């Protein structure tokens, strides 16, 4: 049985997925796309992945992988010094009773679009009232930055937005966002998984830094960050379950064991996994 590390992608990989695949090929990894079931069981114990929730849950369940998630209440438990606004973890039912503008997003996943709503009446009615959401007073960010964190240090970073408009650019080594990110990570200490993504930004009104949100490293856009360094973080965040560190166990995602071909379906005919013998062409 091969012990060569594998890097797995969904059929329609994003630009970040392709860049990470190129980095994995350079490391000599076995890079594959998985068009559908069955998932090759020979990959168990040596696989890492990058992809959306449904794909990640299906593959992780089949291959006994551990996926690391940030805590749902991370933003809600941070002091105002780090958030620059009041944030609370509540239920969707409670959010529907909002009578003032609030920024509302699912605490996990993307079950509905995040955004500012004038009140709670426009929130999705088809979702259960007990669904946990983050609710915050609206703020505007002049610039936003993505920090890929590994073992308590910022491993890779990129700007990704200016006044809410996508605008990615590499960060110089001593950029203030890196210092603020390090301060946040030091404050959270054991309250973070060893591999995670933190988004931080500069508030438009005060010019102060604040945490935007935390995300799973296994499906976060790299933007203009170094793909090699991002891959280090992704591999820790999505890898064999038997390799998970004890300190990361509280952050291990409960994979649903989904067997949903829609999560892995390609425009091509479903079949066995397809090897990537050379770096893929990056497209948008």
Where in this protein do the model-derived segments appear?
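Active-site nucleotide/adenylate-binding loops and adjacent lid/helix of ATP-dependent enzymes
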Residues: 2-187
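Active-site flanking residues adjacent to catalytic metal/cofactor-binding acidic residues
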Residues: 136, 198, 212
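C-terminal active-site "lid" helix and adjoining low-complexity regulatory extension at the edge
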Residues: 204-284
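A long amphipathic alpha-helix within ATP-dependent nucleotide-binding catalytic cores
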Residues: 161-209, 230-233, 237-238, 242, ...
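A residue-level signal for conserved active-site and pocket-lining positions in enzyme catalytic cores
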Residues: 147, 200, 214
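Initiator methionine at the very start of the polypeptide chain
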Residues: 1-2, 284
């Amino acid at each position: 049985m091969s012990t060569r590390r594998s890097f797995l992608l969904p059929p329609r990989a994003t630009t970040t997925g392709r860049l990470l695949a190129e980095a994995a090929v350079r490391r000599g990894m076995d890079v594959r796309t998985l068009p559908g079931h069955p998932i090759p069981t020979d990959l168990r114990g040596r696989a890492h992945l990058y992809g959306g929730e449904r794909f990640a849950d299906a593959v992780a369940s089949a291959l006994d992988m551990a996926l690391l998630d940030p805590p749902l209440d991370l933003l809600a438990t941070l002091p105002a010094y780090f958030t620059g606004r009041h944030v609370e973890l509540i239920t969707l039912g409670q959010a529907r009773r909002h009578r003032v503008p609030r920024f509302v997003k699912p605490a996990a996943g993307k079950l509905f679009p995040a955004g500012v709503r004038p009140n709670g009446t426009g929130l999705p009615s088809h979702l259960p009232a007990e669904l946990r959401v983050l609710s915050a007073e609206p703020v505007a960010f002049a610039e936003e930055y993505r920090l890929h964190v590994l073992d308590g240090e910022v491993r890779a970073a990129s700007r990704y937005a200016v006044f809410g408009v996508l605008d990615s650019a590499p960060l110089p080594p001593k950029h203030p966002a890196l210092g603020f990110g390090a301060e946040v990570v030091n404050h959270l200490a054991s309250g973070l998984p060893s591999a995670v993504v933190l988004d931080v930004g500069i508030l438009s009104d005060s010019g102060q830094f604040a945490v935007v949100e935390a995300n799973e490293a296994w499906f976060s856009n790299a933007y203009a960050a170094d793909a090699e360094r991002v891959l280090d973080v992704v591999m820790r965040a999505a890898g064999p379950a038997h390799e998970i560190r004890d300190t990361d166990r509280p952050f291990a995602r409960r994979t649903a064991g989904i067997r949903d071909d829609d999560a892995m379906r390609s425009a091509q005919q479903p079949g066995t996994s397809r090897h990537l013998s050379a770096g893929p062409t990056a497209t948008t």
